[in-house]
């Protein structure tokens, strides 16, 4: 079985865009924790597309954004790595019961809109690296 790099990159990017748009929709109806979770997924998938592009290999099975960033071999400012570390928490906190309720309380309108805007900006920055 051959590995089609371009097809795999397209798969990750199409899926990332869908997740980002769905996250925006959830933000509008005030489903804040899930909007942030999908924002995380969108970043994860763009990073996976970058991993495939730079390594010509399948992206690893992980949700850790900082690990994926490292695997892209793309120079990223420390501030972006810090953001990725923060957004990885959106995946964990929105899914696991011990963390879920605290995350729901933290996910206010102001917090969620600010973080989702940051995610969109980072998404755009990452897309430009393709």
Annotate the PLM regions.
Residues 1-130:
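Terminal alpha-helical segments
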């Amino acid at each position: 079985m051959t590995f089609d790099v371009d097809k795999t990159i397209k798969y990750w990017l199409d899926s990332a865009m869908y997740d980002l748009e769905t996250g925006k929709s959830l933000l509008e109806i005030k489903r804040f924790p899930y909007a942030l979770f999908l924002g995380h997924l969108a970043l994860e998938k763009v990073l996976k597309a970058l991993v495939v592009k730079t390594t010509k290999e399948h992206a690893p099975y992980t949700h850790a954004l900082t690990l994926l960033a490292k695997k892209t071999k793309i120079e990223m400012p420390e501030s972006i790595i810090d953001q990725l570390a923060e957004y990885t928490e959106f995946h964990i906190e929105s899914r696991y019961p011990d963390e879920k309720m605290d995350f729901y309380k933290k996910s206010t309108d102001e917090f969620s809109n600010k973080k989702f805007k940051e995610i969109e900006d980072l998404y755009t920055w990452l897309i430009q690296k393709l």
